[in-house]
Amino acid sequence: MSTVVKDTHHEEHPSGIMRWITTTNHKDIGTLYLWFAMIMFFIGGLMALVIRSELFQPGLQFVDPQFFNSMTTMHALVMIFGVVMPAFTGLANWMIPIMIGGPDMALPRMNNYSFWIMPFAFSMLLSTLFMDGGAPAGGWTLYPPLSLQTGDAFPFLIFAIHFMGLSSIMGAINIVATILNMR
């Protein structure tokens, strides 16, 4: 009786969209971070245009005060957690392994996971614009009177901020671990 032996090849890498979803390559993840930062920069820029168009002249021109405050809150969160931190992390993913002579980041799976938390967090954050009562209007400090924050939007905002912070902390841990352990 003859037996056919089938070799399993683990060298095959996914292609297409699965390459980007499952990658642990630091340059691919850095590219994903930079593209995400650019997309969020344009979304935050549109929010800034709404804010600036309202401030063009005294009085009400385009939006009511609640929506203006919502835009201020959302613009701050998008620009800090959606542009600045992902752009720095994306550049770090590209530059740090090259600068220290390492083959990759120290924790590549956590690197991938910390990136993929962000699209879900920002989906939650931006979905508050379409909920009853509109997006939370906490201003730059996120310290509004809680009696004014009704509906589901504020809990979604807080949950999204937790996810954005988790993603940022995981990216920072990966950067520090790479610098300390791989140099």
Residue ranges and their predicted role:
Residues 1-183:
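...captures the hydrophobic TM-helix bundle architecture rather than a specific catalytic motif
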